[in-house]
From Swiss-Prot:
Family: Belongs to the adenoviridae hexon-linking protein family.
Residues cleaved off as propeptide: 112-153
Phosphothreonine sites (modified residues): 64
Modifications the protein undergoes after translation, according to the UniProt entry: Cleaved by the viral protease during virion maturation. May cause the middle segment to be shed from the capsid.
Induction: Expressed in the late phase of the viral replicative cycle.
Underlying gene: L4
Superkingdom to which the source organism belongs: Viruses
Protein name: Pre-hexon-linking protein VIII
Assembly information from the UniProt record: Interacts with the peripentonal hexons as well as the hexons in the facets. Part of a complex composed of the core-capsid bridging protein, the endosome lysis protein VI and the hexon-linking protein VIII; these interactions bridge the virus core to the capsid.
MF-aspect GO terms: hexon binding
Residues modified as Phosphoserine: 170
Gene Ontology CC, one term: host cell nucleus
Length: 223
């Protein structure tokens, strides 16, 4: 088998951290050529060479240019930011229920002395307004959900005529850190490393070692 045609390194994915856990040689793709003749060995080498050329071109097309092939933390500029339009929800109105909720609250505190019932036959009831202000009852002081403010600085900003609620789906800050499985497949195409053992040991990529730790940037038992 020609040593000039290397076997690709396959990257593994760590879904908990959103990082590539490292790369190792995919020996399952190697063909059994021990009992083959020169003609068969030549055909096998042609297939392996064609495969490597496809992987090299695929990496140039899909991989994002970056100074570190497998960074421990991906910046927001290298991650796809999914922007979704806001969601509008229709709020159903129940005017009868709203009236009951705002009109049926009895006033629990008034500050006056108790008097016989025949003197005060009128029962005081809350009308869904702010109790520390002398405001006339109007539609703008009522909330459709039946809640009214018992004390505070001003009227509610909730407009009872609004029938829709807008929800913002996207985050206010861009996403950074790890990558998803879909981006991992695009960014980490099987790596073709030409003559991996031809240079000094210090030039061999640490990320192609099985016990390499990306978080500490070290190889267990060596550093």
């Amino acid at each position: 088998m020609s040593k000039q045609i290397p076997t690709p390194y396959m990257w593994s994915y760590q879904p908990q951290s959103g990082r590539a856990a490292g790369a190792s040689v995919d020996y399952s793709t190697r063909m059994n050529w021990l009992s083959a003749g020169p003609s068969m060995i030549g055909q096998v080498n042609d297939i392996r060479h064609t495969r490597n050329q496809i992987l090299i071109r695929q990496a140039l097309i899909t991989e994002t240019p970056r100074p570190v092939q497998n960074p421990p933390s991906w910046p927001a500029s290298l991650l796809p930011q999914m922007t979704q339009p806001p969601t509008h929800l229709h709020l159903p109105r129940n005017e009868i229920l709203e009236g009951r909720l705002t009109d049926a609250g009895m006033q629990l505190a008034g500050g006056g002395a108790l008097a016989p019932r025949d003197l005060y036959a009128l029962t005081l009831r809350g009308r869904g307004i702010q109790l520390n202000e002398d405001l006339p009852l109007s539609a703008s002081t009522l909330r459709p959900d039946g809640i009214f403010q018992l004390g505070g600085g001003g009227r509610s900003s909730f407009n009872p005529t609004d029938a829709y609620l807008t929800l913002q789906n996207s985050s206010s800050l861009p996403r950074s850190g790890g990558i998803g499985s879909e981006q991992f497949v695009r960014e980490f195409v099987p790596t073709v490393y030409i003559n991996p053992f031809s240079g000094p040991p210090g030039t061999y990529p640490d990320q192609f070692i099985a016990n390499y730790n990306i978080l500490t940037d070290s190889v267990a038992g060596y550093d």
